[in-house]
Design a protein with these regions (language model features):
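RNA pseudouridine synthases
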Residues: 2-323
C-alpha cells in the first residue's frame, strides 16, 4: 500500500523530460531520478509512469508516492566462539623434590615482564606446582633462576624450594652452571673454534643489547659488562654455519648479540640482524634458530646433574633445505 506524499502541477509551459525535472528539482543524480521512476514511485495524472524520458507538458500533475519502509529482518544472533589462544606445550624432562628441568618451547616467555603477560613458562608451572609461588625473590618469577629468550627454546631448570633456588643462584653467580646451545648463523664461519669477548651493555633501543667494540689493546672503548662466548663449528652450509655455543657468562641476549658482533647473526632473529644478510631463509625457518641442548648443575648433595636436549623437529627439518 502506498500513500501520496507530494504533488506537483505544472502551470507554466514545460518540455522537460521527467528524469531531468527530478534532478533539477531535488538536486539528485540522474541515476537516482531514474531509479525512482523505474520503481513505480511516480504517478503522472494519476497513472504510474516508468518511462524515465517521459515528456512533461503544461497541466500535468505529478504525484510522488512514498512507499512504506519495510525493514529487513534482523540478522540472527549466533554465539561466536573464539578459539582459545594456543599456548606452546612444555616438555618436563625431570621432576625432583628440589627442582624441575623442562624444555621451554619457542614463542613462550620464561616469566612475565612489566607488561604482566598472562602466558609464560612460570605461570604454567605454578598451576601444576603451586609451591613455586613461595620460591624465589620476585613474585613475577616464581622458582625462576635463569631464563631463555621468548624466541629461543631448550633446557631450563626451575627451583621447587627456596634452598635449591639459593643454591642454583649461587652457581650462576660463580659461573659453574654449564649451558650450551645449538645455533645456526648466517655466513660461513672460517674458524673451527673461537671466543667472543666483547662486553655487553643495553643499547639506546631499550629492547636491544649492544656488544661494545674493543681497542687495539683489547680493552672496551666504553664500559660494559664482561661477556664470554665460546663456539665450535658443527656443520658448514653454502651460506650458513651450524655452531655449538657455550656461554661462560649470562648476559641478556648474549649469544644473539655476540654472534651479530661477529658478523654472523643468528638465523631467524627478529631483533639482531644485518639487512644485507636477512633473506628468505629467515622466513622459511620461521623462528629463532637457537636451542639450549646441554644444561649441567650440582644438586643439594653436591652431585652433578646433566641434561641434554635434541633439536625440535622444525629445526631438524629446516637444515636439509640448506644443502
Amino acid at each position: 500500500m502506498t500513500t501520496a506524499s507530494k504533488k506537483i502541477t505544472f502551470k507554466e509551459p514545460t518540455t522537460k523530460r521527467l528524469d531531468i525535472f527530478f534532478t533539477e528539482k531535488f538536486k539528485i543524480s540522474r541515476t537516482q531520478a531514474q531509479k525512482m521512476i523505474e520503481e513505480n514511485n511516480i504517478l503522472i495524472n494519476n497513472k504510474i509512469s516508468t518511462k524515465t524520458g517521459h515528456p512533461l507538458k503544461t497541466g500535468d500533475t505529478i504525484a510522488i508516492e512514498k512507499k512504506p519502509i519495510i525493514k529487513p529482518p534482523a540478522p540472527k544472533k549466533y554465539d561466536v566462539k573464539v578459539a582459545p589462544k594456543k599456548i606452546p606445550k612444555i616438555k618436563v624432562i625431570t621432576v625432583t623434590k628440589d627442582y624441575i628441568v623442562v624444555e621451554k618451547p619457542n614463542g613462550l616467555l620464561t616469566h612475565s615482564t612489566d607488561k604482566n603477560e598472562p602466558d609464560s613458562l612460570a605461570a604454567i608451572l605454578v598451576k601444576k606446582y603451586p609451591e613455586l609461588k613461595k620460591v624465589g625473590d620476585d613474585p613475577k618469577r616464581p622458582g625462576i633462576v635463569h631464563r631463555l629468550d621468548k624466541e629461543a627454546s631448550g633446557l631450563l631448570v626451575v627451583a621447587r624450594t627456596q634452598k635449591m633456588f639459593d643454591h642454583l643462584k649461587n652457581q650462576f653467580k660463580e659461573r659453574t652452571v654449564e649451558k650450551e646451545y645449538s645455533v645456526l648463523v648466517h655466513g660461513k664461519v672460517a674458524k673451527d673454534w673461537d671466543e667472543i669477548k666483547f662486553p655487553i651493555e643495553r643499547s639506546r633501543n631499550k629492547d636491544r643489547m649492544a656488544a661494545l667494540p674493543a681497542t687495539l689493546r683489547g680493552a672496551a672503548t666504553i664500559e660494559g659488562k664482561n661477556a664470554l662466548t665460546e663456539f665450535w663449528v658443527e656443520q658448514r652450509f653454502i651460506n650458513f654455519t651450524l655452531l655449538r655455543v657455550k656461554i661462560h657468562t649470562g648476559r641478556m641476549h648474549q649469544v644473539r648479540v655476540h654472534m651479530l658482533s661477529y658478523n654472523s647473526p643468528v638465523v631467524g632473529d627478529p631483533l639482531y640482524f644485518q639487512k644485507k644478510q636477512k633473506d628468505k631463509w629467515d622466513k622459511v625457518c620461521g623462528r629463532l634458530f637457537l636451542h639450549c641442548i646441554h644444561l649441567a648443575f650440582t644438586d643439594l648433595k653436591g652431585d652433578k646433574q646433566e641434561f641434554k636436549s635434541e633439536l625440535p623437529p622444525e629445526l631438524v627439518n629446516f637444515l636439509p633445505l640448506l644443502k
